[in-house]
Amino acid sequence: MNALVLEEVRTFQIRQVPQPVPKEDEVLVQVGAVGICGTDLHIFHGLANYHRDELGKPIPLRTHPQILGHEFCGRVAVAGSKVTKARAGDRVVVDQVLNCRNQGRVPRCEYCESGDSHQCEFGKELGVTGIPGAFSDFVTVPESSIVLLPREMPFAKAALIEPLGCVTHACDRVDRASARYGFEGKSRIRYALIAGAGPSGLLFLQYLRNVKRFDGEIFVADLKDARLALAQKMGGTPLDVRKVDMVSELLRRTKGERIHYLIEASGSGAVFDWLPWVIRRQATVLLYGGGHAGKDIGCLTQFQATETTLVTTAGASGGFDKDGTPTTYRLAMEYLCEGKIDADSLLTHRYSGLDQIARAFTEDANREDFIKGVLVRAEAG
């Protein structure tokens, strides 16, 4: 089969690789669509490498090239002999994290036992930790990693289930935190701020408006006009960080009250120049974006002084329904089916073949109008 292989930093090559063969409890998925994630971009540009040896040291691409792609869905091509959940031809989305449950480990680690499978002690991730991902024709996955898709859901939209699952999981982490300000009760959140209007930031905005039914003001900070315009259309108050002083502007707009709930979804180190000074005492800060290049952790001193509830989050995996379905993926799929999330506005760039993906990582990702890219494979139907 064909696969797009990352052989060196910023170097993709289409290669012929062996087509995987599913085990008796696995399915072979023909890739229908795969989203291009910020994590993929970080790995491509050499800013991150999550493929590590037993000591936690990164394994260089020249030693072990990688096949990226973890936000994916497709059609079951072959079902193993013990698979009962799906059969050939079924349309599925995939939870790409390999954990104790889908690896058949007994006993399960403490994280999988508590429903936090994304932190599995023995966890791996398709397309991220060195295991071949969906920038290829086919991928084998455990039966327990799939969720059946409705017939009417296009593959392109289904490729957003994983990133929306990340947002769903992150907001659940905040709900479970013992924080002063919440969406209900006496100390209600009145002002929220999302730093970054990329795909994740815009998903957070829609989640707060349409899932949490939050009716307070949501400021959205970014530096691209197209993203700010879309944020405003989705119910946010846009703030162009190039044109305003964020501290004075937010003090003015909140009448000195400051921000009760701040979501950092940009991954930009520059955010921390103003973030500690715009939040209210005992506010909640959700750290979602990755990277923050060029910044130390000096801002934590201010977080300590104001007793900030700092919530960190990673991934979309978590607990499972009684029938073994990954809960977060099911919820994300339901939000899309119910129309609570506008997927089409986020999918600004579509690609039809592996040979087009490199352009997404080099030229298109820097375009003013680029929000989210997705590869849609016509051959999967």
Where are these regions (language model features)?
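Glycine-rich beta-strand-centered segment in the early N-terminal region that forms part
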Residues: P20-V34, N49-R108, P150-E152
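N-terminal Rossmann-like NAD(P) cofactor-binding module of classical short-chain dehydrogenase/reductase
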Residues: V93, H260-I263
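Helix N-cap at the beta1-alpha1 junction of Rossmann-like dinucleotide-binding domains, i.e.
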Residues: L223-R227, G269, H292-A293
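C-terminal hydrophobic helical "lid"/dimerization subdomain
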Residues: D225, D273-P276, R281, P326-G381
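ADP-ribose/adenylate-binding Rossmann-like module
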Residues: I279-D296, T309
